[in-house]
Amino acid sequence: MSDILTVYGNLFINTKGANKMKVLIIGAHEDDIEFRNAGMTMKFKELGHDVRFLCLCNGNGGHHILSPEETARVRKGETQQVAKILGVQYDIWEDVSDCEIEPTLENRKRLTRYIREYNPDIICTHRINDYHADHRATAQLVQDASYLLIVPHFCPDAPAMKEMPVIMQTVDAFKNPEFRADVVIGIDDEIETKLECVRCHRSQIYEWLPYTKGETVPESEEERREWMKGMDITADTTDEEVLAAKRGYSVRFAQVAARFRKELIEKYGEEKGSKIRYAEALMLSEYGKQLTDENKDTYFPF
């Protein structure tokens, strides 16, 4: 007896074992993607779907001591560690320098060709309102390419996609306009691996970012691990305590759950949703295929 297929647009879901979806997560810098979407990536991978990361610059500006060339080399090595942990292909535009991503026509064509070649069902990237010019430019490039993905005469050397992908924007704390959590994902089961991915970016979390904030980093590895987390998040830690905390990556990921507690309860129910400690969140872009009540759980089945 053949397996039953449920069809949503161009997405075929095998109800006894899903056909692969393709998920493309586009970030400006090495670390942007896993800091925001490592938990979701693990959930997609566990279900047998394919996830690819694309970074639009080489990160060579992210250090205060190393040369740009050495910084790019170190950061590429850090991404390779993450790729191994998560089991993803992690591509980098190595010819683009940090702080120099531009939403040019040339880059629009380059990104359009890349997306068409991969043919993803879902794209995730930054929002346009962001403090960093590279984040804004990356978001602008994705937005500019979105409709063109299905236009055959634009970049005719790369076959146009048959249907636009769902385009999602990754969580941030900016207020103008404020982030809206259209998709929330509890990641308590994935948090330790996500923190392991964060620790891969040693040049950033222990060197460059503390330097920019005037922070002193402990010397021993054990102390660094605790310092990096910021605080212990337990079942008794309240959302108010989490939101009041000032630093740390455990705190950062717990604050997403605290901010969007209402949405987590709506999705998972009161008993489970109220207890989720760590979460990731996504905002739907109006420039891609739209999520509906009928297809939302198909695209985000966790």
Over which residues does each language-model region extend?
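Short mixed-charge
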Residues: 149-163
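C-terminal accessory domains and tails appended to enzymatic cores
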Residues: 2, 8-19, 177, 183-302
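Short acidic, glycine/proline-rich loop/turn micro-motifs
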Residues: 63-66, 178-182
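Short beta-strand-loop elements within alpha/beta enzyme cores
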Residues: 110-133, 283, 287
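Conserved acidic residues
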Residues: 89, 121, 165
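Active-site rim/loop-helix segments in enzyme catalytic domains that contact anionic ligands
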Residues: 2-118, 158-159
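A structural motif
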Residues: 161-177, 197-198
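A mobile, often basic/glycine-rich helix-loop segment
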Residues: 132-152
